[in-house]
Amino acid sequence: MELTTEKLTTWMTLFAQKINDNKAYLSELDTPIGDGDHGNNMARGMNAVIESLNDKNPTDLTTGLKLVAMALISKVGRAAGPLYGTAFLEMAKASKDSADLAQLLTVALAGIKKRGGAKLGDKTMVDIWEVLTPEVADNSLTPEKIEQAVLNTKDLEANELLI
């Protein structure tokens, strides 16, 4: 699937809505190992993403992806901002050569792994991205596969060096 500026805006709008709808739950999940503010941080970041996309109305994908990255880096605290920001910066760089979503997600995942040092099995976002990115490439991603990927992380033990 080709990612366009319009699809990026729709994706970010839907993602922002999900984050805002679930920010209390995300903060609750963060409480045992963090400071319980992940939902609020992500909501603040995604609201900034939407504001930036609406204000600047990018006409090309690279610019749109950079706007997303910069909003996340500047507004989301702790590790999530730099990790998501890196993902979107890597996508922005790669989008100069390709708008293929699977390719963009692959470089985003590589950026996340390099930035955070996580690997499969560390109970991080890498455990989801690593499993589901190939599903995007195969055009076989389903809600059931997403749910299964999430469930598969439930009993993983978090790598304490990454907390």
Regions found by a protein language model. Name each.
Residues M1-I163:
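N-terminal loops that bind phosphate or other acidic moieties
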